[in-house]
């Protein structure tokens, strides 16, 4: 799997919601704040199902109602198209899980 170039990563991030490039870890990341712990856990479960379907898995750090997603392709050593695709799917699931208002 081919790594994305800097420009490709920057362009991909423009299409995503709240993601940033973590250059130090050669990954993209997003932190989401949910209303409470259980809604965060439900979100993590829905993302886990999507990750299994895609056979591509984000690193997830859960701190009460805050979840940080780190996305990279470990076997490739950085960010690939697969990472951008899963990040877009995570965005969809977050939008579905976060109450409007």
PLM region descriptions:
Residues 1-101:
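Long, contiguous binding/interaction regions
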């Amino acid at each position: 799997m081919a790594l994305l170039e800097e420009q490709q990563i920057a362009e991909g991030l423009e299409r995503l919601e709240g993601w940033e490039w973590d250059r130090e870890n050669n990954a993209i990341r997003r932190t989401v704040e949910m209303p409470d712990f259980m809604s965060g856990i439900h979100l993590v479960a829905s993302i886990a199902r999507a990750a299994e379907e895609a056979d591509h898995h984000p690193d997830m750090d859960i701190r009460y109602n805050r979840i940080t997603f780190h996305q990279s392709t470990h076997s490739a050593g950085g960010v690939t198209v697969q990472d951008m695709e899963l990040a877009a799917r995570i965005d969809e699931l977050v939008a579905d899980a976060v109450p409007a208002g």
